[in-house]
């Protein structure tokens, strides 16, 4: 059986996008991993699946599978590619679509200049709902935020915790390019305080409207960009009194613009979505 796919990226965060409405998709965890493999499959940070909605008030359902075969709640860069995909494929003629994700509904809008704005919803800041186990950890206040001290490779690192539909730990660093992201990222991801693991973000504040960001993503490793990570970093920076909305987030894969008015207001992310190529892969070539 041939599986049709489209390869896309959002600021260098790359995806295999599958139309699950017009073809049957039933892959094993090993097949998901092989499809995402850059040596044995197509190669991607994550795999996005377009499906029919399960409720009448949305246009599509959106599923995300990590490169390690685990399914996750949300992906902001993937959401931008999602709306570009369904628009280019003629699956909708709407400029703005409502999409069902694992834990809610998001609104995606295709702008006239080709950029995509995603209404990411309000951030979740209650530690237990991230989820994050704060008991027994040292804390300190900074602005409106509470920072938590984690032991990471023999050092105490102070983090903010934010959920953008998926869990994030955000650390402010002086020089993000030379920070040991590949060494610290896995330690933070698997820290016992995060029962569902966590995406580890490392941001350098350039001015009140600009940051540089690297993210070690849960189940994927460091990626060129992370949309939900950019949102979480900006929320943390605003709450700590370091940033003002809107904020330009510079990643290795490109720039994103994040806006948040605080409190229960939604976070809005704007950035590119690019189609690279289309193809098909023989499922028999993937391990079962």
UniProtKB/Swiss-Prot annotation:
Checking InterPro entries in the record gives: DAP_epimerase_AS, DAP_epimerase_DapF
GO molecular function terms listed in the Swiss-Prot or TrEMBL record: diaminopimelate epimerase activity
- A single Gene Ontology CC term: cytosol
At the top of the EC hierarchy, this enzyme's class is: isomerase
Q: In which pathway does it act?
A: Amino-acid biosynthesis; L-lysine biosynthesis via DAP pathway; DL-2,6-diaminopimelate from LL-2,6-diaminopimelate: step 1/1
Q: Major place of localization?
A: cytoplasm
Q: Name the site position(s) for Could be important to modulate the pK values of the two catalytic cysteine residues.
A: 168, 217
Q: Keywords, A to Z?
A: Amino-acid biosynthesis, Cytoplasm, Isomerase, Lysine biosynthesis
Kindly give the PANTHER family that the UniProt entry links to this protein.
DIAMINOPIMELATE EPIMERASE, DIAMINOPIMELATE EPIMERASE, CHLOROPLASTIC
Q: Can you name this protein?
A: Diaminopimelate epimerase
């Amino acid at each position: 059986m041939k599986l049709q796919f489209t390869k896309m990226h959002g600021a260098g965060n790359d995806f295999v996008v599958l139309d699950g409405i017009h073809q049957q998709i039933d892959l094993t965890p090993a097949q998901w991993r092989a499809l995402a493999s850059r040596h044995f499959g197509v190669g991607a940070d994550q795999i996005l699946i377009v499906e029919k909605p399960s409720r009448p008030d949305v246009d599509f359902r959106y599923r995300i599978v990590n490169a390690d075969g685990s399914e996750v709640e949300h992906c902001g860069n993937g959401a931008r590619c999602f709306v570009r995909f369904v628009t280019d494929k003629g699956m909708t003629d709407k400029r703005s679509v409502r999409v069902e994700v694992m834990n809610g509904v998001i609104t995606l809008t295709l702008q006239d200049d080709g950029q995509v704005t995603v209404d990411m919803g309000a951030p979740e800041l209650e530690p237990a709902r991230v989820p994050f186990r704060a008991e027994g950890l040292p804390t300190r206040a900074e602005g409106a935020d509470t920072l938590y001290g984690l032991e990471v490779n023999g050092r105490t690192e102070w983090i903010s915790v934010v959920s953008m539909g998926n869990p994030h730990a955000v650390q402010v660093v002086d020089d993000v390019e030379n920070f040991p992201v590949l060494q610290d990222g896995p330690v933070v991801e698997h820290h016992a305080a995060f029962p569902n693991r966590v995406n580890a973000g490392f941001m350098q504040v350039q001015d009140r409207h600009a940051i540089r960001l690297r993210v070690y993503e849960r189940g994927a490793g460091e990626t060129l960009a992370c949309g939900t990570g950019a949102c979480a970093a900006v929320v943390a920076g605003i709450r700590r009194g370091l940033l003002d909305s809107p904020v330009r987030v510079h990643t290795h894969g490109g720039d994103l613009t994040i806006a948040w008015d605080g409190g229960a207001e939604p976070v809005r992310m704007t950035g590119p979505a690019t189609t690279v190529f289309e193809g098909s892969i023989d499922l028999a070539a993937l391990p079962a």
